[in-house]
């Protein structure tokens, strides 16, 4: 029994450390809605950690003296860091769903045929679709810039200008530079 006691203490300590790590990671989603957009866009799930930090920054930034501009700059930096993790072999964000992973080539071929068919028609809507289609980024960094631009243009109402120490207490590690 004397030999077993230190092992049990070590296991308990490791278990508590693991639970604290899981709890602190989940606490970072408390004020987050992920990378919320009305459309399903590429990199949404891949950028989720950066979006969680950004959402927390928008909710608790004022409380900890972080401006909206600092939140947005950190958001772009975090997304670019995620993009760099992909390396030079993969310029686009990895797909999350099983179907997306298994049918990557077939999907891109099917999409190109659908777009070609749709864009060959000579209507006003298709001219607009052609303009939008060619503006869409094709790289992870390109999508990071678009997400950053979107929050700069449309995120003003989401940044909390009030301090809320009660709900933000303990979330310092969920903010940029913490």
Swiss-Prot record:
Propeptide feature: residues: 98-130
- Judged by the first EC level, this protein's enzyme class is hydrolase
Question: What family does this belong to?
Answer: Belongs to the phospholipase A2 family. Group IX subfamily.
Query: Which cofactor(s) does the record list?
Result: Ca(2+)
Q: Known catalysed reaction(s)? A: a 1,2-diacyl-sn-glycero-3-phosphocholine + H2O = a 1-acyl-sn-glycero-3-phosphocholine + a fatty acid + H(+)
Does the record carry Calcium as a key word? yes
Example of a GO cellular component annotation carried by this entry: extracellular region
Which sites are catalytic?
54
Organism, scientific name: Conus purpurascens (Purple cone)
**Protein name (database record):** Conodipine-P3
Primary localization: secreted
The UniProt GO MF terms for this protein read: phospholipase A2 activity; toxin activity
Enzyme Commission no: 3.1.1.4
Top-level taxonomic group: Eukaryota
GO BP terms in the entry: arachidonate secretion; phospholipid metabolic process
Q: Provide the protein's localization.
A: Secreted
Pyrrolidone carboxylic acid: residues carrying this PTM: 131
Q: Which UniProt keywords apply?
A: Calcium, Disulfide bond, Hydrolase, Hydroxylation, Pyrrolidone carboxylic acid, Secreted, Signal, Toxin
Role played: Catalyzes the calcium-dependent hydrolysis of the 2-acyl groups in 3-sn-phosphoglycerides.
Signal peptide positions on this chain: 1-24
- Tissue-specific expression: Expressed by the venom duct.
Report the residues modified as 4-hydroxyproline.
38, 42, 49, 137
On subunit structure and binding partners, the annotation says: Heterodimer of an alpha and a beta chain; probably disulfide-linked.
Could you tell me which InterPro entries the record lists for this protein? PLA2_conodipine-like, PLipase_A2_dom_sf
């Amino acid at each position: 029994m004397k030999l077993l006691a230190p092992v049990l203490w070590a296991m308990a300590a490791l278990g508590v450390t693991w639970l604290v790590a899981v709890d602190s990671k989940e606490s970072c989603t408390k004020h987050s809605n992920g990378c919320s957009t009305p459309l399903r866009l590429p990199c949404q799930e891949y950028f989720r950690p950066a979006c969680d930090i950004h959402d927390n920054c928008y909710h608790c930034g004022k409380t900890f003296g972080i401006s909206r501009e600092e939140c947005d700059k950190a958001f772009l930096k975090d997304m670019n860091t995620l993009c760099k993790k992909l390396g030079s072999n993969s310029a686009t964000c990895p797909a999350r769903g099983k179907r997306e992973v298994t049918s990557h080539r077939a999907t891109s071929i099917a999409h190109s045929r659908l777009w070609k068919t749709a864009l060959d028609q000579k209507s006003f809507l298709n001219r607009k679709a052609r303009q939008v289609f060619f503006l869409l980024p094709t790289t992870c960094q390109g999508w990071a810039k678009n997400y950053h631009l979107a929050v700069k243009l449309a995120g003003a109402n989401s940044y909390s200008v009030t301090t809320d120490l009660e709900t933000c207490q303990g979330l310092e590690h969920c903010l940029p530079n913490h």
